[in-house]
C-alpha cells in the first residue's frame, strides 16, 4: 500500500517539477521541393523567433519583443546557425553525394503560436537525386524535445516526416514515397505529444480520479465493482477522444482557426475547472458531457502540431490518422497505469480524503499558473 501511495504521489511531484512552461512545444517546419527538371531543390525553413532568441539572441534592446529590424540585423548569423545544423545528401544509382545548401533570402511569417523566421535556400545536388538523406540537428543541444517537421514535395508525390533528437536522420525516395513509414512517424509523434503535453495528461487525470468512486451523501464513496468503474472510464475517455478528434480534423483542414493564446488559455481553464469539479462536485453523473465539451478545446491544441505543415490529400490523411492514433495509444497507456492503482486504493481513506482532494489542489494550482502566463501578453 505504501508503495502504491508513493507512486501516485510521485506522479504529482513529477508534474509539479516539469510543467511550468506553456503547452506549445518547440517545432520548426522544413519544406524541400523538387521541380520537374534539374538537380536542385527549393528549401524553406520556418524557425520560431523564440527558439532563435534562446539559441543566439535576437532581442537587441531587451524589450521582450523581436522586431523585423532586429531579425534582419542578425539575418546572416541566423542563416549560418540554421544551415550549419542541416545536412542533405542526394542518392542516385547507388551513389551518395553531398548537396550544397545555398541561402537566398530571409522573411518573416506569423504562425498560430507566434513569429517565425523564414529561411529560403537552394539545395544544390551534383545530379538529380532519386532519394534524399536528411540529417537534422537544430536546437537539440538546447531542447531535446524539439521537433523538426519535414514536408517533401516532388512531382506527383508529397510526403512528411518528423525529426527528433532520438531520430535525427531520414532517407526517402522522391518518386515513390513510403506511406507506411510516414504513418509510423506520425503515430510516434502523437504518442510523444500526449506524453509531453502535461496539461492534456492532467486534464485526463481529472477525469480518471473520480472514476473509481461515487459522490453520495456529501462524500466520496468507493464504487462497488471494477466493471462499474471501467464503464465510467469508457464513457469519459470515449467522449474526450471523439471531441478532440473532431476539432483536430477541422483545424488541420483550416475550417476552424483560433489564436494560439486563446486555445492554450482555454486548455488551462479546462484543467482548472476539472480540478475544481473534483473538489466541489457539481457535475457528477454526466462527466462524459464535460469531457466532450472540453475535449473540443484540447483538439485545437493538438492541431497546432500539424496545422502549419500545409499538408493535403493523402499526406494529410496519413498524418491525421497516424497522429490521432498515437494520441489514443498514449491516452490508453495512462489509463492502463492509473486505473488499476486507483481501483486498488479506492476504499482507503488515503485515496478519498487525501489523494483525490490533494491531487485536485495540485492540478488546480498548476492550471491556474498556466492560465495566468498564457493570458498575459
Per-region residue spans from a language model:
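Bacterial N-terminal signal peptides
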Residues: 5-15
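N-terminal soluble domains immediately following signal/targeting peptides that reside
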Residues: 20-195
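Generic extreme N-terminus detector
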Residues: 4-5, 26
